[in-house]
């Protein structure tokens, strides 16, 4: 079970009756009050425990800011790209729902399946600040991982480097 692959959604609605009827399992990580819902075929308690333990290890590494430890566990480019996408769309959902992670058995944790940009593209306003999702004063909480990562100079440098790489494409479109 320690090498189980999985797909999870970070979703404040994870504890709903609808998910219970679907047979979906959820759990919390320390310091968070939003559910991680197991969306993949994880059937046993041992598999569920392995998924939670692995995600907890990743969570602790991210919050620690230890880049070397994070690179052992996560696909860092997927985190950089997802952060940029969430920032460009100013997507308020990222801190509370529709945030997916996946891991192939034995692989690294990846941010995947960008989803649910209706609020970011016009049906909701977070007009308190134009400085991004992790700024203080925003009405919607940031995702704790992005908030922690933006406190790391090396992550900001990775984001800036990637933005410089994709900027010409963005300016063309």
Task: Tell me the role of every PLM-derived stretch.
Residues 1-173:
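Phosphate/dinucleotide-binding and metal-coordinating scaffold of catalytic cores
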């Amino acid at each position: 079970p320690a090498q189980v692959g999985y797909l999870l959604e970070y979703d404040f609605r994870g504890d709903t009756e609808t998910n219970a009827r679907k047979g979906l399992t959820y759990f919390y990580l320390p310091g968070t009050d939003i559910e991680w819902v197991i969306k993949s075929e994880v059937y046993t308690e041992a598999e569920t425990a392995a998924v939670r333990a692995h995600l907890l290890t990743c969570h602790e590494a991210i919050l620690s800011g230890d880049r070397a430890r994070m690179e052992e566990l996560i696909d860092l480019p997927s985190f950089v790209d997802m952060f940029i996408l969430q920032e460009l769309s100013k997507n308020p959902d990222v801190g509370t729902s529709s945030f997916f992670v996946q891991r192939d058995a034995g692989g690294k944790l990846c941010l995947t399946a960008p989803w649910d940009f209706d609020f970011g593209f016009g049906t909701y306003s977070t007009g308190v600040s134009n400085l991004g999702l992790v700024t203080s004063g925003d009405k919607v909480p940031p995702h704790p991982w992005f908030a922690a990562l933006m406190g790391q100079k090396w992550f900001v440098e990775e984001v800036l480097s990637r933005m410089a790489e994709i900027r010409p494409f963005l300016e063309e479109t």
